Each structure stands twice: as C-alpha cells, then as structure tokens.
C-alpha cells in the first residue's frame, strides 16, 4: 500500500499542519483509497469537514465501491491538459527505461503536480520529517517573460497529440511544472509576474 501524508497549508494556520494519511492500493486491477485523520488534527480542528465522503472520526475510512479518490483530493487533480502532460511524461520515461507504460491513477496524478501550483491548501509528504513532494528549485513556475516559450511548447505538444505521436521530452519538461495543476482541456500554464 502506498501512502502520502497530507498537510493543511491554509491561510489561517501559522504553519502547515498534519491532517492525516492518504493510502492507495491496487489489487487485481481494482483501486482503493483510504484516509486516516491524525489525532491532533481531530483534537483541534474536528469542526472542519474536508469532504462529504470523509467523516471526522479516527480510523481508516475507505472510498465507496466504484468511487475514485476522496472528493477533497479530486479537487486538486489535473484536468485533461494536465493529465495529458503527465501521461506523456510517463510514456517518455517508460521508453527511456525500456519498460511497459504504467496506467496512471488519481494517486499518481496527485503526486505528479508541482507543490507550488497545486490547487487548494493541501501539501504532501512521503515521510513526516521529509520534504514536501514535488518541490523543485530548478523547475519553478516560469516568469511572465517566458510566455512565448510556453506557447511554443504547448503548440508542439498539441501537434504531437493531433498526429498521435509522443512529443519531444523538452516540451513536456517545460510544461510539467506550470501546466499540470490548472483545470480544463485546453493548454494553459501558470506564470509569475515579478512586478
């Protein structure tokens, strides 16, 4: 079973606080998700309901059969454009590593999004004392001055999609950080305006 520690980084908190643990398991083609609140979160924030499908009590809670990931986490998942970028990255990596392409789950998509641009107030860690996942000092959200390059990269990925071929790795690498967390089907990317 894979797991991620979920932290709340809400604007009213002084610092990120551990909310609980999100677990994922795939058995015989069937995916299941479970969530367990941290005792301290329940002690101090029991009045905050994160999602209609997670109740504020201790112990493991599972998604309903046939349901994907819990609602509060699905809000942070990429839509079609972000999923396309993450799928193509997986295909390119599989080709380079000479292995079969993995089918990505909602858990994979959640882990694949840049920490800075992930929608909502959740941050994720593998280990309690570890770093937040997908915090990349070298691949930050680009400045507004790189907008033309992002448009070109998006156009190249779209051409590849139309022709049903893998895009070049450089185009995907350029778009993964700024382009996976925003919703919708059309190409888009977040940029920073330093002014």
Language model feature labels by segment:
Residues 1-195:
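Phosphate/dinucleotide-binding and metal-coordinating scaffold of catalytic cores
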């Amino acid at each position: 079973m894979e797991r991620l520690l979920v932290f709340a980084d809400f604007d009213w908190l002084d610092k990120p606080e551990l909310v609980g643990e999100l677990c994922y398991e795939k058995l015989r083609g069937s995916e299941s998700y479970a969530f367990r609140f941290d005792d301290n979160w329940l002690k101090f924030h029991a009045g905050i309901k994160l999602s209609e499908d997670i109740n504020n009590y201790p112990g493991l809670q599972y998604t309903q059969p046939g349901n994907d990931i819990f609602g509060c986490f699905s809000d942070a998942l990429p839509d079609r454009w972000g999923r396309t970028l993450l799928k193509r990255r997986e295909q390119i990596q599989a080709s380079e590593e000479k292995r079969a392409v993995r089918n990505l789950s909602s858990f994979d998509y959640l882990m694949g999004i840049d920490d800075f641009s992930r929608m909502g107030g959740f941050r994720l860690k593998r280990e309690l004392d570890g770093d937040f996942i997908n915090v990349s000092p070298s691949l930050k959200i680009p400045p507004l001055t790189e907008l033309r390059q992002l448009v070109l990269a998006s156009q190249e990925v779209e051409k590849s999609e139309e022709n049903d071929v893998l895009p070049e790795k450089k185009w995907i690498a350029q778009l993964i950080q700024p382009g996976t967390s925003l919703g919708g089907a059309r190409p888009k990317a977040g940029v920073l305006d330093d002014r």
